Amino acid sequence: MFIAHLPAGYILAKLLLKKFKQTKITNKAFFTLIMLGAVFPDIDLFYFYLFDHRSVHHHKYFLHWFSFWLPIFLIALCYFIHSKYTAKPALMISLFSGAALLHIGLDTFVGDVWLFAPFIDQPYVFFEVSSRYQPWWLNFILHWSFFVELLICLIALILLVGKKN
């Protein structure tokens, strides 16, 4: 995914908002947590460009591992449920890490993701984007999958505009 992580986070927040309306988290904090979580795994791009000099695919870094986010999500969610839905920090961690899992799932659509790292060193991807154009990002923008990203953005925009009316 190239441009749809933040809009996908917004869609996720809209879908979950009614379910968690009774919690003591403000709507602003609720949306902020999920939308930050939806883009957070890509902070490894700073390391990728500034220190690693693009020598290792940034999806190999631990912030793009299911094995990193899934235990955080499950432990926080179990604690939230065990607290009879009152542990606000557990809910916040669940929302953030759940959105990070969404990010990784979206990346798997057309980008290599090492789903089982660090245990298995193999990338997985649903659809390959072949390298035909320079610069490299044109390969993604001119691929049919970019339409899916635009669709996600459009759905998020419709939900946002619909909220204001």
How would you label these PLM feature ranges?
Residues M1-N165:
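N-terminal membrane-targeting hydrophobic helices
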